[in-house]
């Protein structure tokens, strides 16, 4: 029994015994999730952190009940730990997307001509607050993001994030109203006519796929890292212990590492590609070979993806223990290249088979035996994560005549 007053940061949840026990500091991100009683692989948490740091928009997809929403909520709480409930409320906006959203009013509010005031939303209040405190990270979590068409209510945000450049890092501005001096309906001050999305705001959208949701367009998927949650390991879950993992952070205390440093930016550019090539010239050949495969089917990617993959590689090189280029590229193929693939057997059968062959170093024959090995995570592949997903997509193509990365 724990006596006296104990800080939450000194407690940790033991999933095997279903008890709370004493732990060390909750500075480390992996320990913090454990203390909350949630089981996520270290690789998954590392990928989420690096994805946010590479670009402040991440999509989490996968089967229901795997913790997509919780990984985003707990990460935001981890960064904001030690703050009062009121302060956390200003820094974190949890938004349940409504199926009737046809424009950005659900996120940004609107000017009401009747009372001549601006009706402010939680997200707009957070954006205004973040603009006043650029040294603090803020989080917007869009739960069930695809209950409405993302292109309709979130397109302004996507366009503005893409408009950031070296000479204009703030990007273009959101249009809010044209009514001059306008007070907020909640009485908390003025609302400007135009507002830049602060670079210290991080967006995460969770996705479920059923008959009530919409699929994403390539335009949306091209602008995010997509992390899939489908792996459920009951044996590890029961023991509360993970298998040895390789993609882990050098320093798991990332509370002050999310915001860009003095020489960093929250957008990608050609400089990231140049920096990645300096770190490992092999990245050119890997990406060029991949482009040559996909170009045959007009499924190739553009310079934005090249820059963002390179940015992720540079971040991983700086922060991941025992950096391995093939491992990092495997993760980026899985998160940046494959999510846009969906279509019929006639469209995707040949390119998907060529892609899974690309995931192996040596020349391979694509048959049922290889697909079975790849589906079980084949360590002989140079890109085993991507090969595993491709094997599933090819199987769906053969059985259903149609496949999609997001399922």
Q: Each predicted region: which residue ranges?
A:
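AAA+ P-loop NTPase catalytic core and its hallmark functional loops
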Residues: 4-257
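Alpha-helical lid/collar subdomain of P-loop NTPases
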Residues: 6-16, 22-23, 242-407
């Amino acid at each position: 029994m724990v006596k006296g007053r104990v800080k939450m940061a000194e407690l940790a949840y033991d999933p095997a015994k279903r008890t709370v026990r004493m732990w060390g500091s909750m500075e480390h991100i992996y320990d913090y999730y454990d203390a909350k009683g949630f089981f996520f692989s270290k690789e998954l948490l590392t990928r989420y952190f690096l994805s946010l740091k590479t670009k402040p928009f991440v999509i989490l997809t996968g089967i229901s009940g795997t913790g997509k929403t919780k990984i985003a909520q707990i990460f935001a709480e981890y960064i904001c730990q030690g703050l009062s409930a009121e302060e956390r409320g200003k820094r974190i906006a949890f938004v349940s997307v409504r199926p009737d959203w046809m424009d950005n009013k659900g996120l940004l509010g609107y000017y009401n001509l009747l009372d001549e005031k601006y009706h402010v939303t939680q997200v707009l209040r957070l954006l205004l607050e973040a603009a006043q405190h650029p040294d603090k990270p803020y989080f917007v979590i869009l739960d069930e993001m695809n209950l409405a068409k993302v292109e309709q209510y979130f397109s302004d945000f996507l366009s503005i994030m893409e408009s950031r450049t070296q000479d204009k890092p703030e990007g273009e501005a959101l249009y809010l109203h044209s009514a001059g001096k306008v007070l907020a309906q909640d009485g908390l001050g003025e609302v400007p006519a135009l507002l830049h999305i602060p670079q210290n705001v991080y967006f995460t959208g969770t996705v479920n796929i059923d008959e009530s949701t919409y699929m994403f367009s390539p335009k949306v998927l091209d602008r995010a890292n997509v992390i899939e949650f489908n792996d459920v390991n009951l044996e590890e879950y029961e023991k509360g212990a993970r298998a040895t993992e390789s993609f882990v952070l050098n320093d798991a205390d990332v509370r002050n590492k999310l915001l860009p440093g003095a020489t960093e930016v929250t957008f990608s550019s050609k400089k990231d590609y140049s920096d990645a090539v300096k770190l490992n010239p092999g990245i050119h050949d890997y990406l060029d070979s991949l482009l040559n495969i996909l170009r045959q089917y007009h499924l190739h990617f553009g310079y934005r993806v090249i820059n963002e993959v390179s940015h992720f590689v540079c971040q991983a090189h700086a922060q991941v223990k025992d950096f391995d280029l093939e491992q990092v590229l495997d993760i980026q193929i899985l998160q940046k290249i494959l999510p846009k693939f969906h279509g019929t057997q006639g469209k995707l059968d040949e390119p998907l088979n060529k892609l899974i062959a690309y995931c192996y170093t040596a020349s391979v024959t694509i048959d049922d035996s290889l697909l079975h090995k790849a589906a079980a995570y084949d360590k002989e592949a140079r890109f085993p994560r991507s090969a595993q997903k491709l094997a599933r997509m090819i199987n769906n193509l053969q059985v259903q005549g149609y496949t999609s990365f997001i399922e």
